[in-house]
């Protein structure tokens, strides 16, 4: 079992930081999961995922490099094994790397033992192919066991699987602590791009809002958080999936949004590793001042 720990005072970001934008790029290429459960494996569905490794990831790397943005790439173990050249390029570009299950399995549907096996398999893939000790993790559709397993079996510094808070907090159990950095769908370029009735219409076809709508949605969230950031600590999760946001019109949404946000004083695009370091430093300082 585990419990949450929250700071007694408002978090304080480093001097000059008003709104950190925490960038996540999901890099996945699953072949055994489908939008349509009766079609597995589903060549139609997984060929869409392949676009990320073939084109989308490279386009996103170019855009992030153009703006000097270094974020976190959440990579599935099987995707790393199939397309190691993408992950090596991500690492070379200076981005942080985190695990994102093995083949994007929905962990909420799996037994605890199976989830642990897949987590270990993913961690091993990063150690073997990249020489990388994973510092962070985001599970696909977390189960009731996910946090327990992270605390009991792994030495991650942060997890990003939950959707339940505006700011990071500590989860504590099994004699250790992990920082939980929540994210949500409302600033996910993939999800704000989908239609109001969900990804698939009654006719079984994709519904999609326009790129212009997606950009407006991101700007609206940014404006609200930037205003709030004048009074207290806030952060903005910004999530992209390379097989969706890496397509030309969606990639332009990311490019244009970064250009927009960079105009504002105190806005910093950052990775989960960096945000975790800032948060932990302030949390320790608060505890020391109380002691």
Where in the sequence are the language-model features?
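Glycine-rich, positively charged active-site loop/lid region within alpha/beta enzyme cores that binds
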Residues: 182-207
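Catalytic alpha-helical scaffold of carbohydrate-active enzymes acting on polysaccharides/glycoconjugates
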Residues: 1-188, 215-238, 244-291
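Surface-exposed cleft-lining segments at the edges of enzyme active sites
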Residues: 134, 201-212, 242-243
């Amino acid at each position: 079992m585990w419990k949450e720990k929250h700071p007694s005072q408002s978090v304080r970001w480093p001097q000059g930081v008003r709104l950190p934008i925490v960038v996540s790029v999901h890099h996945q290429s699953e072949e055994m999961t489908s939008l349509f459960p009766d079609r597995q494996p589903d060549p139609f569905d997984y060929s869409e995922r392949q676009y990320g490794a073939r084109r989308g990831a490279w386009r996103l790397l170019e855009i992030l490099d153009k703006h000097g943005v270094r974020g976190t790439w959440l990579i599935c173990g099987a995707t790393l094994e199939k397309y190691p050249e993408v992950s090596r390029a991500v690492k070379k570009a200076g981005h942080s790397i985190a695990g994102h299950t093995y083949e994007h399995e929905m962990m909420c549907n799996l037994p605890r033992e199976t989830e642990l096996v897949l987590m270990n398999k993913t961690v091993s893939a990063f150690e073997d192919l990249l020489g990388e000790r994973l510092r962070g993790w985001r599970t696909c559709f977390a189960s009731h066991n996910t946090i327990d397993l992270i605390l009991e079996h792994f030495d991650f510094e942060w997890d990003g699987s939950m959707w339940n808070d505006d700011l990071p907090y500590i989860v504590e159990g099994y004699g250790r602590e992990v920082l939980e950095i929540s994210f949500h769908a409302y600033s996910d370029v993939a999800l704000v791009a989908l239609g109001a009735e969900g990804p698939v219409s009654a006719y079984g076809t994709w519904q999609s809002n326009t790129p212009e709508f997606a950009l407006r949605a991101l700007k609206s969230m940014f404006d609200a958080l930037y205003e709030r950031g004048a009074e207290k600590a806030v952060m903005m999760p910004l999530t992209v999936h390379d097989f969706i946001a890496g397509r030309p019109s969606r990639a332009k949404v990311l490019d244009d949004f970064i250009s927009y946000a960079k105009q504002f004083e105190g806005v910093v695009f950052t990775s989960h590793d960096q945000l975790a370091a800032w948060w932990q430093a302030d949390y320790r300082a608060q505890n020391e001042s109380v002691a």
